[in-house]
Structures are given as structure tokens and as C-alpha cells.
Amino acid sequence: MTIINLKNINLTRNKKEILKDITWKVNPGENWVILGLNGSGKSSLLKLILAEEWKTSGEITVLNTQFGNGEIPKLRKRISVVGSFIAERFQPNIKAENLVYTGKFNSSMLYKPYTDQELDEARQLLRQMGAKSLIGRNYASLSQGEKQVLLIARSLILKPELLILDEATNGLDLFAKEKLLKQLQQINQLKTAPTLIYISHHPDEITDIFTHLLLLREGKVIQSGKKENLLNEKILTDFYQEKVEVHRFEQKYFVIPAN
């Protein structure tokens, strides 16, 4: 099964080219980072994958569902998305495990009390993620980093085949960001671990769990492939159109402007 297969995708909006001839394939066992500066087309690409926006031309297949020939509502139940845009949708007094279980219904509201058996599933997931300390706490009492961990747990309650993290560390301080990245490592070790697509403009967030990298600039794929083949000064200088230095420290990559 192919996770994502985009062929010659173009997206035009108000006579402006947003995405230009995008071809990209994600296979099982691969975790990808989409790296690009603001305005590169990352969000538009995400909307196409989620069928929230329609391509101008090209072919899109996600989890073996070809857009135009498959059932999109069923496909959406197999995909989870985490982004800062979701964080403000929840009631401040909702308990952590209740919030996690709302993911079963793709809702931000608690329409009925959940049973202990239902909530035990949410609690067990939080324990597996190393987030046992969040159980029983109100959403409003959590830090930004803890809220993001909770939202990721919520996204996993349906056991999705594809998990997309859209700028998941936005608004997090240094320590919260590092903790969140470690949480992703734990998720990757779950028996039901989904394929990860991580959208970012920070190279230092590319950890060892990610196998591949797609470099997006001004709506075009500049390079794509195994991360170790792309995270070097020659390719990234070409990508950023500014001379950069690439340093690796403790299995992380740091890109800085060259003197």
C-alpha cells in the first residue's frame, strides 16, 4: 500500500500558482518532514492531502484512496491532524482523559459522560505516551507543551494510519519543544504507530524517527529523499538561497547562516 502518492499536482487560486508540479510518494515504514519557510506552500499541500481543497490538475492517492474515485469521508477517519489551530476549540474545564476520548468522535465537545471503560482507554494511551501525570487534570491548567501532548494523544485514540503534525511546536518554549519531540519517539515505538508527516520550518526538529525529507520553496519541490542525503551544506544553501552551515549534535541537525 502507498501512504501518499501525488503526481504532477498543480494548485491555482485567484489566478496565482500556489503549488507547481508537485510529485511526491510516501511508502510504508517512512516518516517524512516537510521543510519550508513561511509562504512555501506547506499548508496548501496539507489541505490537498486532507481533501479540504481541490487540486487544479494532477493525481492524488492517499492510503490507496484515489481522489475523485474513492470515499473521502471514510478516508478522513484514517487520518489524524495535530496543529495549534485545534488547541483553542476545547472547554477549559474538560478533563485530560475526556479530551483525549473526544477524538473518537472527531469532536471538541463533550456531549455525554463517558463510561469508565471508555476513559480507561484514554488513560492507557496517556500512560503509553509517558504522560500519566496529565490524567485527571483540567485542560486550562496545562502548559502549552502539555496541551500539545494531549492533542497528540487525542489524535491517536482512533489508531490512525497517518498522523500529520502541522507546526506542532509553535508557541512552545525550548524545554516544552524538546519534551514534545521525545513524545514523538515514544509514539513511533507503539505497535499501532502511524506514518508520521511533520510540517515545520525548523531543521533542528528533524529527529532520528524521521527517515525522509521534502524541501518545499515557493510552491515547488526543490529536493526530496532520505534525510541523510539532503541535510548537507550544498543542498541546503541551494534550498535557502543563502549560504548556510550544517552541524550535527546528539543526533540533531542545526542549520545556521554562514559567516
UniProtKB/Swiss-Prot annotation:
Domain ABC transporter positions: 4-243
SS bonds (residue pairs): none
Listed InterPro entries: AAA+_ATPase, ABC_transporter-like_ATP-bd, ABC_transporter-like_CS, Metal_Ion_Import_ABC, P-loop_NTPase
PROSITE patterns recorded: ABC_TRANSPORTER_1 (PS00211), ABC_TRANSPORTER_2 (PS50893)
Residues engaged in binding ATP: G36, L37, N38, G39, S40, G41, K42, S43
This protein's UniProt keywords: ATP-binding, Nucleotide-binding, Transport
GO molecular function, one term: ATP hydrolysis activity
Family classification: Belongs to the ABC transporter superfamily.
Name the UniProt record assigns to this protein: Uncharacterized ABC transporter ATP-binding protein YmeB
This protein's encoding gene: ymeB
